[in-house]
């Protein structure tokens, strides 16, 4: 039998002795998974404290730092897709002045964390993110970059609407699809909402 579970949970299953014999390891070796997978992804799928044989196969990997935008809303307001936080802020201010909700967001803890990761990575980069939020280095947490990250979060909060607190992510996605809001920062799974609504990338 097989099951689909989140990567880190595999280790808990293994520690309880409920993972089947590591037969998949022979496939991993013959197919060269160590050379194909990012080391972090590979480790998640190895049992015996992430360093033993493969005991699971990656079937999907999500990314959470996507920006989804309504092209018509942007085009009608003379806005190009932003490529920096300054450009995004300027676009949001323009939408706000036109009476359009710039940032569709659901004020739930996991959604706030999703946006925070995108901002932290976008402003500070990989090394900053690892030093601050993985290794918890105090000098990083107290850095000017951290101040910039929280300042950008404050700005984004100002671009949401009064209905944001508690809103489900797919409702926020629907606001972008329907042209009620300009953009959303959400994982790649939001694509399903756009696809179900018949929207075409680069067109809608």
Predicted regions and their residues:
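Alpha-to-beta junction loops
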Residues: 1-3, 99-102, 178-186
């Amino acid at each position: 039998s097989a099951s689909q579970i989140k990567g880190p949970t595999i280790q808990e299953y293994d520690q309880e002795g409920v993972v089947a014999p590591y037969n998949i390891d022979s496939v991993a070796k013959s197919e060269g998974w160590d050379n194909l997978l990012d080391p972090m992804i590979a480790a998640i799928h190895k049992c015996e404290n992430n360093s033993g044989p493969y005991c699971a196969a990656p079937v999907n990997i999500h990314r959470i730092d996507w920006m989804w935008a309504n092209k018509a809303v942007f085009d009608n307001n003379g806005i190009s897709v932003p490529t920096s936080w300054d450009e995004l802020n300027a676009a949001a201010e323009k939408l706000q002045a036109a009476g359009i909700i710039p940032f569709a967001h659901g004020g739930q803890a996991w959604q706030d964390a999703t946006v925070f990761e995108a901002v932290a990575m976008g402003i500070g980069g990989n090394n900053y993110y690892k030093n601050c939020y993985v290794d918890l280095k105090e000098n990083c947490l107290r850095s000017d970059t951290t101040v910039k990250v929280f300042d950008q979060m404050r700005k984004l909060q100002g671009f949401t609407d009064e209905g944001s607190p508690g809103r489900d992510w797919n409702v926020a996605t629907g606001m972008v699809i329907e042209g009620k809001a300009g953009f959303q920062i959400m994982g790649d799974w939001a694509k399903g909402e756009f696809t179900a609504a018949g929207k075409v990338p680069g067109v809608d």
